[in-house]
């Protein structure tokens, strides 16, 4: 993962990927996971997403992971929260109520951190990684999640040659190839969103869809 790239994006305020509302697809499809309210939910590469607050409001314990200290600070400042802080090998832990964000590299997390995460919400992580890093991401993050872990994965699918990521295109075939050996994959929704994303159209992208997948580890 190109840490310097993401740190610079946050420093320069180039955060067009941040949404000022909770992701509607999260609200629509999260119930399909049928999780108990107290489940601990991993949100890798979380930025300062408002989705963390929504997940906490469902009764979950939320564990975000974010490389940018600025993003972590902005998340808590925007919510008027004063997190408690401590450090570990994983990074700096910032905790306020049911929400914890580790400011560190998701690729370095081990089972001691991830072992009790019974759910994962991946809207911005897999699509942020170039193809060469995605298998490693599965092997270093998803592989350390416990058996029975359930997840909601949201992807983008567009002709990669028409636009340089991130976010990158990850089509249904790649999702099944990446997860298929250790995870059950169920496609919940796949729809065209090009008209809703003028930045992609302005970049010359001719087709754009989003995919939503329910994951469950064997």
From Swiss-Prot:
It comes from the Bacteria. Gene3D superfamilies: Vaccinia Virus protein VP39. One of its GO terms (molecular function) is thiopurine S-methyltransferase activity. GO terms for biological process: methylation; response to metal ion. Its EC number is 2.1.1.67. S-adenosyl-L-methionine binds at residues 10, 45, 66, 123. PROSITE patterns: SAM_MT_TPMT. Pfam families: TPMT. The keyword Hydrolase does not apply. One of its GO terms (cellular component) is cytoplasm. Its main location: cytoplasm. InterPro entries: SAM-dependent_MTases_sf, Thiopur_S-MeTfrase_Se/Te_detox, Thiopurine_S-MeTrfase, TPMT. It catalyses: S-adenosyl-L-methionine + a thiopurine = S-adenosyl-L-homocysteine + a thiopurine S-methylether. Keywords: Cytoplasm, Methyltransferase, S-adenosyl-L-methionine, Transferase. Coiled coil: none annotated. It is found in: Cytoplasm. The keyword Methyltransferase applies. HAMAP family: Thiopur_methtran (MF_00812). Belongs to the class I-like SAM-binding methyltransferase superfamily. TPMT family. This is Thiopurine S-methyltransferase. It comes from Xanthomonas campestris pv. campestris (strain ATCC 33913 / DSM 3586 / NCPPB 528 / LMG 568 / P 25). The gene is tpm.
